[in-house]
Amino acid sequence: MTALDTLRGKYIEAIASAADEAALEEVRLAALGKKGEISLKMRELGQMSPEERQTTGAALNRLRDEIDASLRARKQGLADAALDARLKTEWLDVTLPGRPRRAGTIHPVSQVMAELTAIFSDMGFAVAEGPQVESDWFNFDALNIPPEHPARQEHDTFFMARAEGDDRPPHVLRTHTSPVQIRAMQAQGAPIRVIAPGRVYRMDMDQTHTPMFHQVEGLAIDRDISMANLKWVLEEFCRAFFEVPSVELRFRASHFPFTEPSAEVDIRCSWEGGQLRIGEGDGWLEILGSGMVHPKVLAAAGVNPDEWQGFAFGMGIDRIAMLKYGIPDLRAFFESDLRWLRHYGFAALDMPDLAGGLSR
């Protein structure tokens, strides 16, 4: 038996008998450390003849690799044994109930959008969408709001800067969802019935206004449409949305550039104990604006105003959500407060429909 065979037997036995990782590390250092026996023998190769160096060097490399492999295998074996021992002392009762997790809730704005969609879909309205960054033409000119019109200042618009040297009118963050109506008429022509819910932007911030809020606007274009049709649609909407058997609306003459005639719409209500009651009492509450679509708006959208007529209406989604669900501050809608959302939110899978009830 050669000296290397003796060395091999010594360390293979020491590795096999190592009781823990600390003892195994001592064996590794004794064999392969900087001052280990195998490492020292590797240094002696420089003192040997080329023939001896070739033979002994190959044998030492094989021994070193074998010892290293044995060390790794033993280390893994010790780790597996430690894990088995720990698992034998630990146990889990799989019959115990799981930890409760809070279920997510639907934001009131999303809920009200779904309610609006359910109501107007039942009346034959489709949902239309459009870009939130709009051209000056779609947001103003096509809606009978020319550059000199004072309504442009009233909107407190967010204008988007163009590149230096570009003299075209700036794009804007849309101030209403009315541009969607223009795009829908251009794409589909007449007749048409659509609602356009979505985000709009104006530079305003207080308890009842935020720089970004949500609107829904409705449009119906057909032959022989009148204010009577508008009144019926709005009454049916309010009855279904506020979930009351009857409502009474009051139309007050107003002015909007894109409708003629125009009317603000109030709903009969009362306040009792800090709660709003729709359809009863002696009070009136403004909820939306409406009117017959201006002939210039129809013409701008490519619809012949001599052949087609229509009505339009618009309301703030956040506002009617506040009224229906008793939410006092509009700013809370956008503060991402989980406590607020858990209080005012809705069950994720309980989608509103007219048959089962809108809010449950």
UniProtKB/Swiss-Prot annotation:
Q: Which Pfam families match?
A: Phe_tRNA-synt_N, tRNA-synt_2d
Q: How is the cofactor bound?
A: Binds 2 magnesium ions per tetramer.
Q: Which PROSITE patterns match?
A: AA_TRNA_LIGASE_II (PS50862)
The residues that hold Mg(2+) are 260
Keyword Cell membrane included in the entry's annotation: no
The answer to whether UniProt assigns keyword Manganese to this entry is no
A GO BP term, please? phenylalanyl-tRNA aminoacylation
Q: What are its E.C. numbers?
A: 6.1.1.20
Q: Where in the cell is it found?
A: Cytoplasm
Q: List the disulfide bonds.
A: none
Q: InterPro entries under this entry?
A: aa-tRNA-synth_II, aa-tRNA-synth_II/BPL/LPL, Phe-tRNA-synth_IIc_asu, Phe-tRNA_ligase_II_N, Phe_tRNA_ligase_alpha1_bac, Phenylalanyl-tRNA_Synthase, tRNA-bd_arm
- What is catalyzed by this enzyme? tRNA(Phe) + L-phenylalanine + ATP = L-phenylalanyl-tRNA(Phe) + AMP + diphosphate + H(+)
| Molecular function GO terms recorded | ATP binding; magnesium ion binding; phenylalanine-tRNA ligase activity; tRNA binding
**Cofactor section:** Mg(2+)
UniProtKB keywords: Aminoacyl-tRNA synthetase, ATP-binding, Cytoplasm, Ligase, Magnesium, Metal-binding, Nucleotide-binding, Protein biosynthesis
Enzyme class, broadest EC rank: ligase
Q: Which GO terms describe its cellular component?
A: cytoplasm
Family per similarity comment: Belongs to the class-II aminoacyl-tRNA synthetase family. Phe-tRNA synthetase alpha subunit type 1 subfamily.
Task: Cite the record's note on assembly.
Answer: Tetramer of two alpha and two beta subunits.
Name by which UniProt lists this protein: Phenylalanine--tRNA ligase alpha subunit
Natural source organism: Cereibacter sphaeroides (strain KD131 / KCTC 12085) (Rhodobacter sphaeroides)
State the gene name recorded for this protein: pheS
